[in-house]
Design a protein with these regions (language model features):
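Acidic/His-rich, divalent-metal-binding segments that scaffold phosphate/diphosphate chemistry
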Residues: 3-107
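Short, surface-exposed helix-loop/turn micro-motifs enriched in polar/charged residues
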Residues: 60, 84-92, 114, 135-139, ...
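Inter-helical turn/loop segments and adjacent helix faces that build the functional surface
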Residues: 79-83, 126-139
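His-Asp-centered metal-binding catalytic motifs of divalent-metal-dependent phosphohydrolases/nucleases
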Residues: 90-111, 118, 122, 126, ...
Length: 174
């Protein structure tokens, strides 16, 4: 995978144990307003994904997905600016796609189609749908992996930035 795509789509590894996350004591930021219409990506793939997911998810779950986006966007712009130093637009587009699809596997229709966990089912569904919408393979795979691992925190190894962000932001976005 080209190095540029690694940065653009949130692939760089971070510690799975979250040792890279600022503590409450060290995170000295003031509250910020997040204007959704200003921070939400407007690319064709995001528009297609948003329409698809909005029609597939219950309203509460869809709204949860949008809240997760806002929390994660704020976390990155306040505490992880290095993550977006070279590819801000692409990173947040990928982030929006991960947020939209992260619970797609929880619907009764999608749970009834498989014996896999909702994370795996949703990840694979997102991979297939995003590629059909024209997302680059590396971007669709980043979203897929983040969804598969979003309920899998741990103490050892690493996870992609996108995966870690989904884990953390979903904890706030309930």
């Amino acid at each position: 995978m080209p190095k540029q795509q690694i940065e653009e789509f949130g692939w760089p590894a971070v510690p799975r144990n979250r040792s890279n996350i600022p503590s409450k004591a060290s995170a000295k930021t003031t509250p910020v307003d997040a204007n959704f219409t200003e921070i939400w990506p407007q690319s064709d793939v995001v528009k297609k994904a948003q329409a698809h997911v909005k029609s597939a998810l219950p309203e509460e779950t869809y709204n949860h997905s949008l809240r997760v986006y806002c929390y994660g966007h704020t976390m990155v712009t306040q505490h992880f600016t290095a993550w977006i130093a070279f590819a801000r637009e692409e990173f947040f587009e990928t982030w929006a796609l991960a947020c939209l699809f992260h619970d797609i596997g929880t619907t009764p229709e999608n749970r009834g189609d498989t014996h896999m966990s909702f994370e795996f089912q949703g990840g694979f569904m997102a991979l297939q749908q995003l590629q059909a919408f024209g997302a680059p393979k590396a971007q669709a795979e980043s979203v897929c992996e983040a969804i598969i691992r979003h309920q899998d925190p741990g103490e050892t190894g690493t996870i992609s930035r996108m995966g870690q962000l989904v884990q953390i932001a979903t904890e706030f976005g309930t």
